[in-house]
């Protein structure tokens, strides 16, 4: 089939839906390479959603849920081999290997393009090729960050409508020549004539490849989440971090929270935690401290740049939440539950109840019988395997969140007063520490550490360094990335920089129990952080930073022994001396590009510890 005979290449009526010549040429080039049966330009309309979801139900990919309980919502079960991000098959193909750095997989870009071009040849035979224009962040931005994903997966088109500002409006924003990120995706499962499709097509060979200088993403073989929804980690973090480095801003793996004091003053906080450390729960916190309220602007990604007034402003580039389902319930995160229960949600790899609803571990009420994520019968107290996959997901529109901040769609973003780093540590790291200054805060972020959880490859429980929680998402050298943070701080007005804090909700006593109750009670720590911003809260200067005592926190009405809180806040020199060689080992791994400012902070810490 020549490109001239591929139906839909020039739009449904033969009139090209855009005059963007670079986009039209790229669509034609990809169609000629991948040989789809037809081309469809996605418009993001309700009609398109209805058509595609009906098609997915008919194909057996989607199961329509009970419209009374979960209106306009669907369950998808993936192939058991295609369930998570694959860090081992994720590549940063910068032109020079030195620019990828020690934390990324690198292949020469020319070699990678040749390999993947052969994989893409004819890979969409028998399928529809969708052209999906989208915008990351508000469409009204001065410099909108646009993208086009070409995909052969209806699941991807439907999910991109939830997760991004997708369709006709984004295409119009591109005009005739605006730059855009090219994101090419195929499940890698061509269909021969008359061949029966499977509910979840994918390929054992997988590549998730980024060409940072060319602003291109090539993904092959996976239909799942971050491997296939290329606006998410691939664009918003890996490609955007490279853009941000070139253009003088920050693309970060952070939630954005709006905290409102009893005096009705708003404070905006960005926070970076690795997977499974409570980012979504903090983003949607219900404060337990009387008079305090919280609203959310995002639970995963923040793009931050300095405004004309010298303050750092953040926007969330996403349009939906793509959250981990297990552990989410009406007490741990009532706002997330309300968001998805409003409908228009796609669930992946959770369990199905007998009355056509969804269930996962940690959700209230254990049913006697389920269909598990592999499509098998599951019986309470009899079946030994999990009903939902540990990385099962909900994909739901942000606009449905009951505590969504009104500024969520403001292209100017919100001014950030505090940046939090944090991880999951049983020992050593106090509940909260304030950095001495910006550079010391960058050192804190550079040495962020967390015990491995089921959300990442690797042995559960081992401590892994995860700089700014960006380890799997850096689009360039980690040393250059840390230096970018240092330089941005140096060029800013120090009095207007956000204060930087490090939190650890997960410290345990010698008997193994958690010393701090977490969840909504974390608002007591946030209240102290606001007090430090305002200069009204006390702290003790320690070797690692400024740390409160239990008496400095508002513990009214909290059923926790103040001695436990003091233990959660304790800075123990002997534990920190054990940390020193671990940090040294990490800095050796980063190599020659470790910024001198970060090294200076490390030397100063060693001296303070004596």
UniProtKB/Swiss-Prot annotation:
This is Phosphoenolpyruvate carboxykinase [GTP]. The lineage of its organism: Bacteria, Bacillati, Actinomycetota, Actinomycetes, Mycobacteriales. Its EC number is 4.1.1.32. GO terms for molecular function: GTP binding; manganese ion binding; phosphoenolpyruvate carboxykinase (GTP) activity. Mn(2+) binds at residues 233, 253, 300. Belongs to the phosphoenolpyruvate carboxykinase [GTP] family. The keyword Lyase applies. Its cofactor is Mn(2+). It is an enzyme of class 4 (lyase). It comes from the Bacteria. It comes from Nocardia farcinica (strain IFM 10152). InterPro entries: PEP_carboxykin_GTP_CS, PEP_carboxykinase_C, PEP_carboxykinase_GTP, PEP_carboxykinase_GTP_C, PEP_carboxykinase_GTP_N, PEP_carboxykinase_N. Catalyzes the conversion of oxaloacetate (OAA) to phosphoenolpyruvate (PEP), the rate-limiting step in the metabolic pathway that produces glucose from lactate and other precursors derived from the citric acid cycle. One of its GO terms (biological process) is gluconeogenesis. Substrate binds at residues 85, 224-226, 275, 391-393.
